[in-house]
Amino acid sequence: MHKRLLILARDFNTAQRWAKEQRLSPGQWVYVSAFYNIQGNAESEYVLLDNWLERPDANILAETLETSRCVESERFRRSDIL
């Protein structure tokens, strides 16, 4: 199992543009909608990234996204997230 970068962004196109700028290949990153939460309810786009990073269910979120088969992660630096 290899690690992928989770890119938290307001839409897929924004995440894809940022990933291309970082020279990431498609298999190296996964888009995470800033509007998504574990319950599946809409949230403000102004997600508090620090709070999101500290959530113990962040790995569950990554594993349940349709765009991700499997994401293994311990912790993400703030600079890793759009």
Locate each region found by the language model.
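Short, flexible loop motifs at catalytic/binding sites
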Residues: M1-L82
